[in-house]
Amino acid sequence: MSNLSFAQREDSSYVMVCRGGGIWISRDGLSEYNQLTDRRVYPDVKGRFEDPVIWRDHIQYHLIVNDWLGRIAFYLRSKDGVNWVTDPGEAYMPGVAVHEDGHSEGWFKYERLKMYQDKYGRAIQANFAVIDTLKHEDKPFDNHSSKNISIPLNPGLLLTVLNDKPITAGTKTIRLKVQAEEGFHPQTDMDISSLRFGASEEVNYGRGSKVLKTENDGDDLIITFDGKGNGITENEFAPKLIGRYKNGKMLYGYARLPYVDYVEPILSARAPVFSESQKGWNGNIEVQNFGQVSSQKASVKIEYKKEGKMVKVASAAVPALKPYEKADIRFATKADFEKGEDYNFLVTIYSGKKVLSTFRLNRKVVE
């Protein structure tokens, strides 16, 4: 593996992303890393991906990955560091190094991104390796060069949603507190009429909830938004504020939702192992909780795909598991596996009818 990037979780464990886009977790950063994903978490587009960088702030996990051939990077967000959503647009591309006076640095390629964070975990500075031509055209004693450059970032605002009940399409009003910081005074620095709040899919395109009124709260500002058009669904974990400062520059920020659990169990299964006896086929499968809190009882189902249809192999109960605890689950199956045939297995872990995780693998049961 290469191009590894790490973020520390709340319990001091670590989540890691590798160049291939797999997500791994280690209990302390020194013990073994276990891969939880069976496919890359990057956007489902063609690209030569490398140099992923992952970090966690007080709201969520962030991930940027670079397509070195296309010279474009993508930005993803996650509640738990395992399941990711991709934001539209580009995280960066040639032309992003622009000074306050308008001068633009014409670097050909930006790579090896690293983030400098503040005490909240917010990214406040991006460090890049840059070059002004193709690598193989940068020769000794020529006029080309590569450098390390640092670009200051807009860290985003500190926001708190004050609604106690879940926000839906029917929510009448949304109350949001904007916290004052050194150098930022929300009561005087924001263009209030420009503010929009809601799901990223809405506010990124100029939609979202509009301001109804504001009220001062010490040095902070409480903004009441009309709930109409917020776009927040049951899967939302970090709604977004976007708008302008009075000086015309962009402002933004993410907020947590007070009714969402941000630290949950993360159940993951290993590949099932089968053995044949006189009575038929038996199997066992290991399920481990990589979450930071205990899990409830769950279930696991094993299937394989044949002629376009899913064939059930077995299902079994998964006991409640403490953080990092594992269970070896045994089962019997009426399935009859053929010698030399490849099986496309799907392992699904459920909590009731809710899918917690899936794991796909292709393997022969009988050589």
Locate each region found by the language model.
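Low-complexity, acidic Ser/Thr/Pro/Gly-rich terminal tails and inter-domain linkers that flank the onset
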Residues: P152-K165, V260-G280
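Intrinsically disordered, low-complexity Pro/Gly/Ser/Thr-rich segments with frequent PxxP/GP/PP motifs
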Residues: K309-E338, I349
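Structured beta-strand segments within beta-sheet-rich domains
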Residues: V203-Y254
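Terminal connector regions
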Residues: G243, K334-E367
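Short, solvent-exposed loop/turn segments enriched in Ser/Thr/Gly
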Residues: G170-R175, D191, E234-P239, Q278-N284, ...
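Short acidic/proline- and small/hydrophobic-mixed sequence motifs that coincide with surface turns
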Residues: Q292-A298
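Carbohydrate-active catalytic/glycan-binding domains of CAZyme proteins
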Residues: M1-T160
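Asparagine-centered strand-capping/turn motif at beta-strand->loop junctions
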Residues: E286-Q292
